[in-house]
Amino acid sequence: MKKATTILDIQKMKAEGEKISMLTCYDYPTARIMDDCGIDMILIGDSVGVVYAGYDNTLPVTMEDMIYHTRAVVRAQPKALVVADMPFLSYQTDMVSARLNAGRLIKEGGAAAVKIEGGVNVAPVIEAITSMDIPVVAHIGLTPQSLHRMGGYRVQGRNNEQAEKLLADARAVESAGAFAVVLEGIPAALAARITSESGIPTIGIGAGPSCDGQVLVIHDILGLCEKYAPKFVKRYADLKPVIAQAISSYIQEVKEGAFPTEGNSFN
């Protein structure tokens, strides 16, 4: 039986050149399937607000939302390392709230680590949370909680000034104690440089093939998202028509009296 994955295992994978697989997950049955497939890391992302709740962005997601979905995933008892996103306003206002909310995701949610968006600006927060022995994954580049400042979901680091800022962000979060860093929406060459210079694993999403690992949203790879899928997404299945066919067949059989049959009934 596979043992539970730890942050030491993830760091060892970088050292040995083994790519790290990570997907978002928000519910018990999907977590079971992912773990059976051998996923290395599961992220309960605040993307749940977009793909599950139908919000236009991640900003409305609350701590209660994140704890609820983290609990659901953890009940599947995955061997994968479970990381929970800290949602907007859960760590930006003050250090006490940041520490408390990180602790809630561990204590109430059951996560093994938390993820925080930002670089130099959140380094003190990362340091404060890791001082509580809570592992932190940093997230730099295109940070969805900052979409209004960035003018939307735009690739970051394309000019020299932005690239230097991202290099500084990567150094800052590592120095602050993050055990891994997500690189989102940045040029592949810049991600490769950050990966080579970083002592911690890099997990890419729209950051090219040189990162130590990759993460995608589960609904995107299954073809279940109604909204536009970005260039970096690869669809591994198209389940929407499969689900639609099953629902349509059910409706038709109910209307025609073909379901339930004797085999679906009790004597």
Curated annotation (Swiss-Prot):
It is an enzyme of class 2 (transferase). 3-methyl-2-oxobutanoate binds at D46, S47, D85, K115. It catalyses: 3-methyl-2-oxobutanoate + (6R)-5,10-methylene-5,6,7,8-tetrahydrofolate + H2O = 2-dehydropantoate + (6S)-5,6,7,8-tetrahydrofolate. It is found in: Cytoplasm. Its EC number is 2.1.2.11. The active site is at E184. Keywords: Cytoplasm, Magnesium, Metal-binding, Pantothenate biosynthesis, Transferase. Mg(2+) binds at D46, D85, E117. It holds the Pfam family Pantoate_transf. One of its GO terms (cellular component) is cytoplasm. One of its GO terms (molecular function) is magnesium ion binding. InterPro entries: Pantoate_hydroxy_MeTrfase (IPR003700), Pyrv/PenolPyrv_kinase-like_dom (IPR015813), Pyrv_kinase-like_dom_sf (IPR040442). This is 3-methyl-2-oxobutanoate hydroxymethyltransferase. The lineage of its organism: Bacteria, Pseudomonadati, Thermodesulfobacteriota, Desulfuromonadia, Geobacterales.
